[in-house]
Every structure is written in C-alpha cells, then in structure tokens.
C-alpha cells in the first residue's frame, strides 16, 4: 500500500492512498480539474509535480513549479526542478514545497510504501513540557525496549520550541542529524527515535506509538581487499532494496560475497564504498543512533550452555536493554520472545540439553530481547536436519510478518526458499545476479 501523508500550512494532516486512485500517472497540484492529488494551498502551483506509479516503486518529477520541490531521499537533500526528471522515492521519503527559510509556510508530504499498524496521533503543546519515552507516564509513549523511560522532552523556551535529549541510550535524530544535548525545532521538522518518526508543526507533534518495519537500500556497494597485485574486488557495484517486513535470503556459491554483503548492509563492516540507507537514513553515518534496531545472529551459537534458557536470557537482558529497565519489564520481554520462537516450555531447561534447532532458536531469542526491527542471520540453518530447518524457516517468516521484522539471512541451502519474500543471488566476483 503506497500512501502520501500530507501536512499543509495550517498544520492539518491527511493521508492519501495512491494505489486506490488507480492511475499510472498522478498529477499533484492546486488545480482540482487537472490533478489527482489536490492541495488547495496558495504555496502550491496549479500543477506542482507528477507521480509515476511503477509496479514496485514510485517516482516523482517536479513540473516546473513556482517554488520547486525539496526532496529528502536516501540521504540526499536537494531542490528539484523540471530538468531533474524523475526521482525514485524510497519508503519514508519526504517532499517539502515552499520557502525552506519559512518552514511554517511549507507543505510536507511523507511517502510510505508499507502498511502501517496504526493511525497518526496528535499531541498539542500546553504550558508544560511534553515528555517522550517508554514509560506510561509520558505524554507520548513509544512501545519499544530500546526507547529510554524518558527519552527526550520538548518545551517552549524564549519563544522557541526546544528538544532536549535526556541522556537517552540510543539518541534522537532531527532531520537525520543527531541531537547533541538540545536543539531548536522548526516547523515541519522530522524527529526520529530508533524507527519511530514524528513531525513537529505549529504547536503539535504528530506520531505513531508503534512502527511498521524497516526498509533497507544498498546503493553502489563496492569492496576491495588486498594490495598491489593481490588486490581483489569482492563486492562489485551491488544495488538492492529490501522493503519493510520482508524475509530475504542471500544465496550464491562459495566466495560470491554473501556474508561480505550482509556485513556491509548491517553496518558491522564499514570498510566499503557506496552507501546503505535504513529508512532513508545513512546507516554508517548514523550507526550509533540506529544500532539498537539491528540484531545479528552469527553462524556459531554464542550462548552459555551451563545456564537454563530463562536465566541466560535474563543476564542478556541486563546487557542489551536500557539501564532503566525494571526487572518486571525484563521478565515480560523474556516471556514474549520465548513465545515468538516457540521455546516457552523449555525456559527452565539447561541450554546444553537443547537440540541443535532449539539452540539456534535460543540464539535468535537473545537478539529479540531488544526488539530489533532489522534482523540479520548468518547460515542459521547450517547443520540442521531438513525437518528442523523447515520449522526454523517458518518461524523466521512468521517473525517478519507478525512482529514487523525485516529479516535478512545468508544461506547455502535452497530447499525452503519459497518461504522467503525475496532472494538476492550473488555470483562470482561479488556481482549481484538476481
């Protein structure tokens, strides 16, 4: 479902389902007789722009409008004009129309290509500060273990709206840039905490308490190892897109660069050229702010075998979850992840007594504690019998859809690839074949 969320100059919000219009080309503008997407605002040209609805994507072109269109897309911020032609939009791309120096006189459009789990909510500012965090006492509650109890506050100060980061574990981004202590907010600013997006406009915060998933886009990824005559390219101009909540397998022959690619797009290997965008934010540049939404399960299970499963998860929760997390919250999260991986009845079993498939599920449970939305696994089915492998693949597929996880795994086996939404096939020399 491809949608536009629009905030106009009066700070009113509305949502348009682009697919429901049912046309390949959609004009955006003030003229209701010509345009399918009508914005009755004087800042908008009669015909402002055009959306091109492709099978798997949407592109936008400015139609030589009076004010142009500012686009924030894949880490790029620029003013579009007719001569730029079509620009491919990614999930959570932001378009702004108007004078960039007068943001209160701008119209903002947020493009989404994934199904949202809930509608936008609106929080008005009064005389008291607004607090945002995990705890139920906040005015804006974000349901994620990675969000601090009180993550940040917003208040009026000397005629400005100021956002203060309250020493949160995972930080705050405003328009893609990390907040160092505090920052002044401008109208139509985009606030991001982990994978939660919020907008500030004219004394209101628009937000969602739950998120729909993470998109990932790899652009021109190249990696070279060795020196001199031993120099070798192991990733060769790889471009790929992974949509929110997709279950994706990376396959290919030995030495094709499967694990190398996964290490790059997960942010754990930063020594490559090109860029990786996580919900439109440069993953490498903002890795500190985004790392808590990433889970990584290595091929070798890293779990302590002389503990019961529940006790091992409790120790891990103390390491992975914010320091202000209460024991009761940890217990609730452990119960939830054991249910996700079908290990509830084994919570008091010593890990050494678990089967190979159960140990792999235990490793997955470890990473699920912090509720990562982007999940990577290296050869998760290696060494498992066919029946156990199929059950694990079914669990991963279910996690992607029911728990809003974007899951990427490297695998050699092909028996159960029909359970995946997408397959990335790597060939010799680190080339993307399919």
What is each of the regions a protein language model found here?
Residues 1-66, 73, 79-145:
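Intrinsically disordered, low-complexity acidic Ser/Thr-rich regulatory segments
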Residues 364-365, 392:
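Hydrophobic anchor residue at the start of the ABC signature
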Residues 305-322:
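Q-loop/switch helix immediately C-terminal to the Walker
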Residues 375-378:
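Catalytic Walker B motif of ABC-type/P-loop ATPase nucleotide-binding domains
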Residues 266:
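Helix-to-loop junction immediately C-terminal to a conserved catalytic motif
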Residues 314, 329-346:
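Conserved ABC ATPase "signature" region
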Residues 216, 234-235, 291:
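Conserved structural motif at the start of ABC-family nucleotide-binding domains
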Residues 369-373:
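A short, proline-enriched helix->beta-strand linker immediately N-terminal to the Walker B motif
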């Amino acid at each position: 479902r491809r949608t536009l969320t629009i905030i106009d100059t009066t700070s009113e919000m509305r949502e348009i389902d682009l697919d429901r219009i049912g046309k390949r080309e959609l004009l955006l503008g003030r003229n209701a007789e010509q345009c399918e997407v009508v914005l009755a605002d004087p800042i908008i040209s009669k015909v402002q722009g055009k959306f091109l609805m492709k099978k798997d994507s949407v592109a936008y072109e400015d139609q030589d409008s009076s004010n142009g269109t500012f686009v924030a897309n894949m880490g790029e911020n620029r003013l579009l004009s007719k001569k730029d032609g079509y620009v491919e939009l990614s999930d959570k791309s932001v378009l702004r129309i108007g004078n960039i120096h007068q943001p209160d006189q701008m119209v903002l459009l947020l493009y989404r290509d994934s199904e949202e789990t809930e509608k936008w909510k609106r929080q008005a500012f009064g005389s008291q500060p607004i607090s945002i965090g995990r705890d139920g006492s906040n005015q804006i509650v974000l349901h994620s273990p990675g969000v601090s109890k009180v993550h940040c506050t917003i208040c009026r100060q000397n005629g400005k709206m100021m956002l203060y980061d309250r020493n949160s574990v995972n930080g705050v981004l405003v328009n893609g840039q990390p907040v160092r202590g505090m920052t002044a907010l401008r109208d139509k600013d985009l606030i991001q905490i982990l994978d939660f997006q919020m907008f500030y406009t004219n004394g209101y915060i628009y937000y969602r308490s739950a998120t729909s998933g993470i998109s990932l886009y790899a652009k021109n990824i190249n990696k070279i190892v060795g020196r001199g005559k031993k120099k070798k390219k192991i990733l060769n101009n790889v471009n790929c897109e992974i949509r929110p909540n997709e279950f994706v397998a990376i396959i290919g022959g030995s030495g094709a660069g499967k694990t190398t690619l996964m290490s790059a797009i997960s942010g754990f290997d930063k020594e490559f050229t090109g860029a990786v965008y996580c919900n439109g934010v440069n993953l490498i540049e903002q890795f500190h702010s985004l790392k808590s939404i990433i889970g990584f399960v290595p091929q070798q299970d890293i779990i302590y075998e002389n503990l019961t499963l529940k006790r091992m998860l409790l120790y891990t929760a103390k390491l992975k979850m914010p320091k202000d997390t209460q024991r009761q919250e940890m217990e609730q999260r452990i119960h939830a992840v054991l249910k996700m991986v079908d290990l509830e009845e084994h919570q008091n079993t010593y890990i050494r007594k678990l089967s190979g498939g159960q140990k792999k599920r235990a490793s997955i449970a470890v990473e699920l504690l912090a509720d990562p939305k982007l999940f990577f696994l290296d050869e998760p089915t290696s060494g498992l019998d066919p029946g156990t492998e199929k059950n694990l693949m079914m669990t991963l597929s279910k996690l992607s859809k029911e728990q809003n996880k974007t899951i990427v795994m490297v695998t050699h086996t092909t028996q159960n690839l029909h359970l995946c939404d997408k397959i990335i096939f790597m060939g010799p020399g680190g080339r993307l074949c399919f």
